[in-house]
Each structure stands twice: as structure tokens, then as C-alpha cells.
Swiss-Prot record:
Subunit structure, as described in the record: Interacts with MPDZ. May interact with GRIA2. Forms a complex with CRB1 and PALS1. Interacts with FASLG.
A single GO BP: protein localization to synapse
Tissues where the protein occurs: Expressed in the retina (at protein level). Highly expressed in the retina. Lower amounts are detected in brain, testis, ARPE-19, RPE/choroid and fetal eye. Isoform 5 is retina-specific.
Biased composition (Basic and acidic residues): 1-17
Record's GO cellular component terms: actin cytoskeleton; adherens junction; cytosol; plasma membrane; protein-containing complex
One Pfam family here: L27
Key word Coiled coil present: yes
Protein name: MAGUK p55 subfamily member 4
Region (Disordered), start-end ranges: 1-22
Domain of life where this protein originates: Eukaryota
Length: 637
């Protein structure tokens, strides 16, 4: 970068003159001179960019460019013409004459100079320029070319261990073998010599007339090194003028299981949550995409948004009818399964170490919270228990039914962009998620206790009566049932449920209160509530807490206990741990596309360190977020 000293003295008058052989009538140089003269009046003053611009115009490399420009302009204005366009022939004639002349040192030196290779090359270049012989002369076309004969093009490609990057098909009417598509990033696309629609005539000297596409593919597969194609070029080559788009896969796709894919080998498999770069959307049914995790490879075929949504819809309607399917999530269980799933339906939170094993009665626990040095909101037994039962609430079901049904056949791709939080922006909401007993609540507690001035939970809402030692806005926001239900119907409640006849929940406004204070809001959610949180105003970063293997879970939870409606201090059983692992797999299978980060809770200390690191990256490093979040922010400004 060119820098200048603002305190420097103005340049001398002689320095303002450009050191070039510039013609005064030259427009560009004259303008630059005038600019330098004007800038010299402001040089050294506190004017942004003046010194930098002056130094730029006065730099040696720009002066050298101006010299070259002036020389070219001078040559152009003189309109010089060569003395002869046949200087090389004239040189040969001079050499022949010198041979007949009596020998002398001068004549011998002249003869050696004219016969020197460099001088001959100089004269050859002179004659080429003088004769304007810049392109090779093609032989004239013969007069007896049949009008019906198509123009041919010979294409040679050197194939190493890389795929050719093209697919072929047979024309239904003519039976010709055509190039169906050119895969982005493949050998054929990089060469720029083959286009979709080109007709193959020969491959390595073998005519493809009458062959099936599979036979042509076999010829290509057996070829090594150089592959020679003889093709009839398409009259109007397709041009991909579309802008590249990045999407998050909201479903999974396996080309090997799709009978409709045009070329299985060219298919690109992906899983939920993968970020794809869509490089070609010219085909209405099959797009070309690549994973950003592997940008070096060529693109592959994926179903278009319309086609994949249609496949999802066909699969959805082909399933056996299940009444009230929209009310169920992967966490829901039938009444017959209730006794076998204590850890899921009846458990409050069974976390590591001694947190849950020292669980007090509800009244005593809340009173202890009042006497703490700092108060942590949102850790009430009733709040956690009602959240586990929220899917049984008729109110919850009536509001969420439509969204749940829609999400089952929702958009298979979600357009995303890179988002970098600016220092002036509010922090992103941190959402923790995981099966019961994995340690979500304890991780959140330790995170807030680690730095309560930086991390905070949102204060929940409740319809129960405030107790004598409680304060409105500290333990809970105490509201009427009518107010609570209005918040639900206006979609201002992120989560809610009912416990002992009272409603509990966390509102958007409660989260915003924490964010406006310049703190990071940390909350834990059930997976079925995640859609309501994914808004542009909160920009949540979802972290999934995953249990470790059975051996590690037995060791870390040997002293932990499960708190249920029916038992107190019930030890973890192997079936409880197995159910926790199974539940985590189901959550990851159904909701994994919403997870921004996954932490395996092998030990509470390591998991907490990983959580801190993940939160820091979420707030400070670029992340993929839905494009609607950014467009909504732009419209609101």
C-alpha cells in the first residue's frame, strides 16, 4: 500500500512536471499534469486521500506506463509505413552481391552480421508485421461440398485418473448419441470444447452409429490417456448465466436408491445439514451441485427443489395412514410405551455429577434460588417438567398442528448465506438441545455460573400465583392465563407447557430483553419447538448435546439419579441409558438439519469447554444462516 506523510512539505514546482516525453497535445498526459498541479495546492493539508492520490500519480511505475503510452501514441500519430515489406529478400540479395565483391574486413563483418540467426529472425519479424501476416492462410473451400453434410469438430481430451464429467443419451427420434449434460468442474467443462447437445460421431476412431449409450460408455471406460471425439457441434451452445446459490439440505438424498436419476454415477449424495453450492439450474428437474466441504471435486446431479419436493410428497402419501400424525414428534410416545420410557416422558432432567441427585422439593428449591449470590432464572422443576409434557397440551397441539404438517413435506433446500455478526449487532441466541439426562441443563447452568455478566437465561412466563419471596421479572413473569394464551396465538412464545394446572413458557420478548442488555441468551429447547425460534430477529445458533457411548455414560452417571413423578433418587438403569442413546439418534435423524454444532458429552468439563468455544465461534466467525434472515434485516433498515 502506498503511504504518504501528511506533514511533508509541498513538492517543488519542478517536481510537478511529469518525467515523460509527453506530447503537450496528448490528452491523457495533459489531464494528469493538470490533476497534479491541482493536487499540489492541497498537498500536506488535512484532506482525505489527497496525499495518497498525489503519490499514486507520481509513482515510478505510473511514469513508466505513461512513457510507453506516449511512445505508442507518437508512433500512431506519425503513421509510419515500412520502407519495404520484403526486407529478408533484400538481405539475401545483398549477401549474394557481397560474395562477388573483393574480400575486405568490413565486407566480411557485414556478411557475418547479415547471416547471423538473430538478424535473420529480426528481418523475418519485420516482414511479417509489414505484410500483416498475423494469421495462417486457410486453403479455399472446395466447390463440391454437399449442402447436407454437417460440420465436424475433432476434440482431444487427455484423461488421467479424473472423470470425464459428461453424460450422454440417445435421441428418441433419430437415435443419435448426444451429449446430455456437461458436469461443472469436470474435464469436459474445463476444456470448453464439448457442449450439451453435441452429437457424437466417433470415439477414438470407432463409429457410435447404432450403438447404445451403455456401449459408448464402455468404450470411454476402456480408454486411457488421450480420448478423441468426432462431434457435430450444437448450433446454439447453452450458456449458464445463473448466479451460484448456496443451500442447506433439509433432507437426505442417495442416488443409488433413486431409479429416476439420469446417471447414477453422476449423482451427488448428501445428508441433512450439508451445505451445497448449486452451480447449474438450467435443467428444471436435475441441478448440479457440489458440497462446500469438498470444493475440489466436480459437481454432481441432485434433484431440483421442485422434483425433490414432489418425491417427498409421493413418499409421504405412500405411507400408511396414522391419525393425528401432525401432533407427534420423535419425542412423543404412545400410552402403551409409557411404562417402558421413564427417562423420556416422566423424567425431569437427570444430569451429570450431583446436580439432579441433590434436587430439592419445588418450594425449597425455589426459595434457595432466592438466597443465591446471583439469581439464575429458568431452572425451575415445574418449568422443566411441563416442557417434557408440552406435546400433551391441547392448546399446544392446536397451534402447532399446521406447522408440523407442513414441515413434513416442507422445502427440501433452504437458501443460506454467510453471516458475520458485527460488533454493533446483538448477540445470537444460543439454543441447547439434547435428550433427557444428557446434561443440557447442567451445561447451561455451569455456563451461566462461569460468567453471569456475559451469559444469562431468559426469565420465563407463568400463570401461577406469585409466592411471598418471589419478585416479578426475577423468577418468572407472572401473567394471567388470557395474556399467556394471547402470546401463544400471536406466536410470541418460543416454548410452553402446562404443569399442575399452570402454564409455563419462554417468550420472544424475554429473550430480546437479555440480548438488548448486551448479553448472550442461553436456553434449552425441545426439538419440536425449534422452528419457532429460527427467526431473523433472534438468529439462533443451535448446539446439539449428544450422549457418548454406553461405557462412558455408565461411568459418568454412576452417581447420578433420575427424578420422576413416581420415584425420587432412582438410579440410572442400562435401559435408561440405552433409551437416551436411541432418543438422541431419533432427534438427530429428524432435526439434524437444524443443528449448527454437535458436542459429544463424554465428560462435563470437556463438554463445557467445547461449548464455550462453539459459542465464541458463533458470535465472532462467519456462519451459514438462512438467506431470509439477512434479507429481512435489510428490509427493516
Amino acid at each position: 500500500m502506498i503511504q504518504s506523510d501528511k506533514g511533508a512539505d509541498p513538492p517543488d514546482k519542478k517536481d510537478m512536471k511529469l518525467s515523460t516525453a509527453t506530447n503537450p497535445q496528448n490528452g491523457l498526459s495533459q489531464i494528469l499534469r493538470l490533476v497534479l498541479q491541482e493536487l499540489s495546492l492541497f498537498y500536506g493539508r488535512d484532506v482525505n486521500g489527497v496525499c495518497l492520490l498525489y503519490d499514486l500519480l507520481h509513482s515510478p511505475w505510473l511514469q513508466a506506463l505513461l512513457k510507453i503510452y506516449d511512445c505508442l501514441q507518437e508512433f500512431k500519430e506519425k503513421k509510419l509505413v515500412p520502407a519495404t515489406p520484403h526486407a529478408q529478400v533484400l538481405s539475401y540479395e545483398v549477401v549474394e552481391l557481397l560474395r562477388e565483391t573483393p574480400t575486405s574486413p568490413e565486407i566480411q563483418e557485414l556478411r557475418q552480421m547479415l547471416q547471423a540467426p538473430h538478424f535473420k529472425a529480426l528481418l523475418s519479424a519485420h516482414d511479417t508485421i509489414a505484410q500483416k501476416d498475423f494469421e495462417p492462410l486457410l486453403p479455399p473451400l472446395p466447390d463440391n461440398i454437399p449442402e447436407s453434410e454437417e460440420a465436424m469438430r475433432i476434440v482431444c481430451l487427455v484423461k488421467n485418473q479424473q472423470p470425464l464429467g459428461a453424460t450422454i443419451k440417445r435421441h428418441e427420434m433419430t437415435g443419435d448419441i448426444l451429449v446430455a449434460r456437461i458436469i461443472h468442474g469436470g474435464l469436459a467443462e474445463r476444456s470448453g470444447l464439448l457442449y450439451a447437445g453435441d452429437k457424437l460421431v466417433e470415439v477414438n476412431g470407432v463409429s457410435v452409429e447404432g450403438l447404445d449409450p451403455e456401449q459408448v460408455i464402455h468404450i470411454l471406460a476402456m480408454s486411457r490417456g488421450t480420448i478423441m471425439f468426432k462431434v457435430v457441434p450444437v448450433s446454439d451452445p447453452p450458456v449458464n448465466s445463473q448466479q451460484m446459490v448456496y443451500v442447506r439440505a433439509m433432507t437426505e438424498y442417495w442416488p443409488q436408491e433413486d431409479p429416476d436419476i439420469p446417471c447414477m454415477d453422476a449423482g451427488l449424495p448428501f445428508q441433512k445439514g450439508d451445505i451445497l453450492q448449486i452451480v447449474d439450474q438450467n435443467d428444471a428437474l436435475w441441478w448440479q451441485a457440489r458440497k462446500i466441504s469438498d470444493p475440489a471435486t466436480c459437481a454432481g446431479l441432485v434433484p431440483s427443489n421442485h422434483l425433490l419436493k414432489r418425491k417427498q410428497r409421493e413418499f409421504w402419501w405412500s405411507q400408511p395412514y396414522q391419525p393425528h400424525t401432525c401432533l407427534k414428534s420423535t419425542l412423543s410416545i404412545s400410552m402403551e410405551e409409557e411404562d417402558d420410557m421413564k427417562i423420556d416422558e416422566k423424567c425431569v432432567e437427570a444430569d451429570e455429577e450431583t446436580f439432579e441427585s441433590e434436587e430439592l422439593s419445588e418450594d425449597k428449591e425455589e426459595f434457595v434460588g432466592y438466597g443465591q449470590k446471583f439469581f439464575i432464572a429458568g431452572f425451575r422443576r415445574s418449568m422443566r417438567l411441563c416442557r417434557r409434557k408440552s406435546h400433551l397440551s391441547p392448546l399446544h397441539a392446536s397451534v402447532c398442528c399446521t406447522g408440523s404438517c407442513y414441515s413434513a413435506v416442507g422445502a427440501p433446500y433452504e437458501e443460506v448465506v454467510r453471516y458475520q455478526r458485527r460488533p454493533s449487532d446483538k448477540y445470537r441466541l444460543i439454543v441447547l438441545m439434547g435428550p433427557s439426562g444428557v446434561g443440557v441443563n447442567e451445561l447451561r447452568r455451569q455456563l451461566i455460573e462461569f460468567n453471569p455478566s456475559h451469559f444469562q437465561s431468559a426469565v420465563p412466563h407463568t400463570t401461577r400465583t406469585k409466592k411471598s419471596y418471589e419478585m416479578n421479572g426475577r423468577e418468572y413473569h407472572y401473567v394471567s392465563k388470557e395474556t399467556f394464551e394471547n402470546l401463544i396465538y400471536s406466536h410470541r412464545m418460543l416454548e410452553y407447557g402446562e404443569y399442575k394446572g399452570h402454564l409455563y413458557g419462554t417468550s420472544v420478548d424475554a429473550v430480546q430483553t437479555v440480548l438488548v442488555e448486551g448479553k448472550i441468551c442461553v436456553m434449552d429447547l425441545e426439538p419440536q419447538d425449534i422452528q419457532g425460534v429460527r427467526t431473523h430477529e433472534l438468529k439462533p445458533y443451535v448446539i446439539f448435546i449428544k450422549p457418548s457411548n454406553m461405557r462412558c455414560m455408565k461411568q459418568s452417571r454412576k452417581n447420578a439419579k433420575v427424578i420422576t413423578d413416581y420415584y425420587v433418587d432412582m438410579k440410572f438403569k442400562d435401559e435408561d441409558l440405552q433409551e437416551m442413546e436411541n432418543l438422541a439418534q431419533r432427534m438427530e435423524t429428524q432435526f439434524g438439519q437444524f443443528f449448527d454444532h454437535v458436542i459429544v458429552n463424554d465428560s462435563l468439563h470437556d463438554a463445557c469447554a467445547q461449548l464455550l468455544s462453539a459459542i465464541q465461534k458463533a458470535q465472532e466467525e462467519p456462519q451459514w444462516v438462512p438467506a431470509t434472515w439477512i434479507s429481512s434485516d435489510t428490509e427493516s433498515q
